[in-house]
Amino acid sequence: MLFDSHMHCDYSTDSSMNISEAIRAARKANVGMIVTEHWDYDYPTNPYAFLFDVDDYFKQFNVYRSESILLGIEVGMQKHIVTKDEALIKAHPFDCVIASMHCVNGRDLYEPNSYNGLTKAEALQEFLEDSIANVRLYRDFDIFGHIDYISRYMPYEDQELYYEEFPALWDELFKLLIDGGKVLEINTRRLDSLKAVETLEVLYQRYQELGGRYISLGSDAHYKEHVGRRMAVAKK
């Protein structure tokens, strides 16, 4: 069964979808699903916005758990909270752990002022270098989420990622993931853009050339209408 391995429900502050709606949407899309609620310790703009009661999460959602409905978490990577994050992961029976870059050196990538004074090249170099630093530190995760997260929010005319601009950094990141046995996610959120598909395809091809064998597909759904979205495009 094909799984949508990235979605947010009742325990994610920014989600407008509950678990029952997600299950119905996944069945309609004929996909399995992994709930991956947000967990971001010390989030720059609001330190408590993306935390939740993990024990209650399992207590309430365990009844839904099955071969086609799994319970995971999406951990926001930051170098100074590795110990806290990994203690949380070890303490709970997550079926899947996504590790993602939502911040760079203590700045929220969602916020426009995080890019003040930076050219696109400078912002991307910092993003890749901090991604590499975090992947070196974090051990207990399964999937590295949305490599193009920064493309959603960086305020530049061209928001795409080009392998040829930072080949050494992309290679280093991919090799770390491969050597660590981690899976690279194809996040389907931006796959409605042909330009995004074309530029991301180059990156995923390079990941494969370096020895990457596995990818995951994730819609990053926060609404029921987005569960399983663009999975056919991602499969190609």
Predicted regions and their residues:
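An N-terminally biased module of ancient metal coordination in phosphate/nucleic-acid-related enzymes
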Residues: 1-79, 91-93, 153-155, 160-164, ...
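Conserved, mostly hydrophobic/aromatic
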Residues: 6, 26, 97, 146, ...
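Alpha-helical scaffold elements within enzyme catalytic domains, especially in hydrolases
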Residues: 25, 63, 133, 176, ...
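A structural motif
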Residues: 30-31, 94, 141, 212
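Hydrophobic residues within beta-strands of alpha/beta enzymes
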Residues: 33-35, 97, 144, 184, ...
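Flexible loop residues that form catalytic
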Residues: 38-39, 102, 149, 189
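Extended substrate/RNA-proximal surfaces in nucleic-acid metabolism proteins
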Residues: 47-179
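Active-site-adjacent C-terminal substructures of enzyme catalytic domains
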Residues: 165-228
